[in-house]
Amino acid sequence: MKKYLGVILAALVLTGCPSRPPEPTEPPATIEPVEPQVPTTPTLPPGESVPQPPKIQTLNWEASINPLVAQMLQADGVTPGSILLVDSVKNNTNGSLPIAKATGALYSALSSGKAFTLVPREQLAAAKQTLGLSVDDSLGSRSKAIGLARYVSAQYVLYSDVSGDVKSPQIDMQLMLVQTGEIVWSGNGAVQH
């Protein structure tokens, strides 16, 4: 019985505790439509014009490469009819250059002469893929170029790179004997615009 009395007393005490008074409710805010302002278009004062973007400079790879190839073909120690691996030209400048065009100009300059038998591009691409190299990646180092030349049974490898400032680049070419790694010929020149 005392238990029931204690429970009832606790219930009465708790129900008698003051609770928070109900907060007054506010009426909802009314929304007033606002007219959007029409933006004014700025007008340029007469005489001001938009500056022209810089013109893209084109490089004359054929005119830059052909004299170097002519020098190379007359170098001592070059055996006519030998198999030559032409490595793709490497870009060592401070910007971006159309290196694929340079490699194409190198191939066309060498294929017009009869001094070398060039490793076909398809065979070179297949060999790079077999060795786990990217097809359009320049080999990056002379030792990799010589290793690839050994893989395709070439006697010579032509390593070329373009260096310096992108606005006035220099092309360097080295003809190397695959068997020994000896540099048979080396030449360089400015890339013409």
Swiss-Prot record:
InterPro entries cross-referenced by the UniProt entry: LpoB
Subcellular location: Cell outer membrane
Lipidation (S-diacylglycerol cysteine): C17
Residues with lipid group (N-palmitoyl cysteine): C17
Parts of the chain that traverse the membrane: none
Gene Ontology MF, one: enzyme regulator activity
Keywords: Cell outer membrane, Cell shape, Lipoprotein, Membrane, Palmitate, Peptidoglycan synthesis, Signal
GO BP term (any one): regulation of cell shape
Gene3D superfamilies: ABC-type transport auxiliary lipoprotein component (3.40.50.10610)
Record Pfam families: LpoB
Main localization (coarse): membrane
UniProt entry tagged with the keyword Lipoprotein: yes
UniProt keyword annotation of Lipoprotein present: yes
Entry superkingdom: Bacteria
GO CC annotations on file: periplasmic side of cell outer membrane
Subunit (UniProt): Interacts with PBP1b.
Protein family: Belongs to the LpoB family.
Record function comment: Regulator of peptidoglycan synthesis that is essential for the function of penicillin-binding protein 1B (PBP1b).
Name under which the protein is recorded: Penicillin-binding protein activator LpoB
